[in-house]
């Protein structure tokens, strides 16, 4: 039996590691969840994700409720108060229980002398909640995005930025990819219905299903047997443009965790696929995904800027480059992105993308297809990146996705749609 732990203090420390130390929640959370009971795993995740989603609001409230911020060794208390405020604002946890557990969290972080302070701040919020929220709703913090990102979205999407921000602040839908080598989408939807769950097919992507209500993967018909994979609809859209064929040599570059690698093999089971990623640790997930689905691919660790180091002079019929990016299209799925990214990262990422594109292009056969994809919504990484590439690359031609003046297809995040995603299909003349 797992030792009873204070979830509020665990959430506070996790959020602190994200915001203060720049660590990714997807690295921090799984080891923490191993320490708690199954029923507490979901609540711990809810507290971490929720606080990061609404961090601007919680920070704003603390600045109103406290004369001066907590600093130094007491900084964790700042995040513990955030966890308390989040529960009072956004969960169904009874207020007395939320307060009691949050105050007890002070003992777990070895700050028992601050229990009274935490209790006082949270009770003050309860008394002043109405007027504080009215004031908050007229502040810039209400958009729940850092100011640098808000400015970029407003500049890029003067008519749509508010709907993008709104989508980013929602909980994400759960999208699945039906493995067409096992079932048609309709036959798997019938199995889902028999299991007491409801799913909706995507209008454009033939394998994509949105669950009416997110569910644990072990509850999905045939998940362990590889009948279905969790993958956002927009990520599945890459196959529409790549159109892999049996017998072809295909490179999936920046492949981890392997969702697109396995999708290529579902669409073209007899393709020869090479999956490459710079991160050796994340490549283990590519192996895991291939194993669960019973598929084979050549998996290599390598830097996309130096392809000759891992493929020599080899050329490919098709290349999928899912480029490293700001991930500004998947904020609703990874709210820590808002606080991990900085404005200065964008030109650095654009430079990296440009270097990878230039390096990998010679490894595409004449007449071959390269699909450039990102989960970003920022033009510097997307349409402007491809426009510049087309201008400097004489044998590259845009195909089916946009115009040379406005190249690529940009998906924006939507409540019943996929994440923010960009695609450009390029043909080598």
UniProtKB/Swiss-Prot annotation:
Keywords, in A-Z order: Cytoplasm, Methyltransferase, RNA-binding, rRNA processing, S-adenosyl-L-methionine, Transferase
Residues annotated as the enzyme's active site: 375
Stated name of the protein: Ribosomal RNA small subunit methyltransferase B
Catalytic reaction(s) noted: cytidine(967) in 16S rRNA + S-adenosyl-L-methionine = 5-methylcytidine(967) in 16S rRNA + S-adenosyl-L-homocysteine + H(+)
First-tier enzyme category under EC: transferase
PROSITE patterns xref list: NOL1_NOP2_SUN (PS01153), SAM_MT_RSMB_NOP (PS51686)
Signal peptide coordinates: none
Broad class of the protein's primary localization: cytoplasm
The keyword Lipid biosynthesis belongs to this UniProt entry's keyword annotation: no
Cell compartments where the protein resides: Cytoplasm
Record-stated family: Belongs to the class I-like SAM-binding methyltransferase superfamily. RsmB/NOP family.
EC number: 2.1.1.176
UniProt GO BP: regulation of DNA-templated transcription; rRNA base methylation
Residues that coordinate or bind S-adenosyl-L-methionine: 254-260, 277, 303, 322
Protein role: Specifically methylates the cytosine at position 967 (m5C967) of 16S rRNA.
Record GO terms (molecular function): RNA binding; rRNA (cytosine-C5-)-methyltransferase activity
A GO term from the CC aspect: cytosol
Paired cysteines (S-S): none
A Pfam short name: RsmF-B_ferredox
């Amino acid at each position: 039996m797992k030792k009873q732990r204070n979830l509020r203090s665990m959430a506070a420390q996790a959020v602190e590691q994200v915001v203060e130390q720049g660590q990714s929640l997807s690295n921090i959370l799984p080891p923490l969840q191993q320490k708690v009971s199954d029923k507490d795993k979901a609540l711990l995740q809810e507290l971490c994700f929720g606080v990061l989603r609404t961090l601007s609001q919680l920070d704003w409230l603390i600045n109103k409720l406290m004369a001066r911020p907590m600093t130094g060794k007491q900084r964790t208390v700042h995040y513990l108060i955030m966890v308390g405020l989040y529960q009072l604002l956004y969960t169904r946890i009874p207020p007395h229980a939320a307060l009691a557990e949050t105050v007890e969290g002070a003992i777990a972080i070895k700050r028992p002398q601050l229990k009274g302070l935490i209790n006082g701040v949270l009770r003050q919020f309860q008394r002043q909640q109405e007027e504080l929220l009215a004031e908050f709703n007229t502040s810039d913090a209400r958009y729940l995005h850092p100011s640098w990102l808000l400015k970029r979205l407003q500049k890029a999407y003067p008519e749509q930025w508010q709907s993008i921000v709104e989508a980013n602040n929602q909980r994400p839908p759960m999208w699945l990819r039906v493995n067409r080598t096992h079932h048609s989408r309709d036959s798997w939807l019938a199995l889902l219905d028999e299991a007491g769950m409801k799913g909706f097919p995507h209008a454009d992507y033939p394998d994509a299903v949105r669950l009416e209500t997110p569910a644990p993967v072990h509850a999905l018909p045939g998940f362990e047997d590889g009948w279905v994979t969790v993958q956002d609809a927009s990520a599945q859209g890459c196959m529409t443009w790549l159109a892999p064929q049996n017998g072809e040599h295909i490179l999936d570059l920046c492949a981890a965790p392997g969702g697109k690698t396995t999708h290529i093999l579902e669409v073209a089971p007899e393709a020869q696929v090479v999956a490459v990623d710079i991160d050796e640790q994340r490549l283990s997930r590519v192996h895991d995904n291939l194993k669960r689905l019973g598929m084979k691919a050549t998996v290599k660790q390598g830097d996309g800027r130096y392809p000759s180091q891992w493929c020599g002079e080899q050329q490919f019929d098709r290349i999928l480059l899912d480029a490293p990016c700001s991930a500004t299209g998947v904020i609703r799925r990874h709210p820590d992105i808002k606080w991990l990214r900085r404005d200065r990262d964008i030109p650095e990422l654009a430079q990296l993308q440009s270097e990878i594109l230039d390096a990998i292009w010679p490894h595409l056969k004449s007449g071959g297809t390269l699909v450039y994809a990102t989960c970003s919504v920022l033009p510097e990484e997307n349409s402007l990146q491809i426009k510049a590439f087309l201008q400097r690359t004489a044998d590259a031609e845009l195909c089916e996705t946009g115009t040379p003046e406005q190249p690529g297809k940009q998906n924006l995040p939507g409540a019943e749609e996929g994440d923010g995603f960009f695609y450009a299909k390029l043909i080598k003349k």
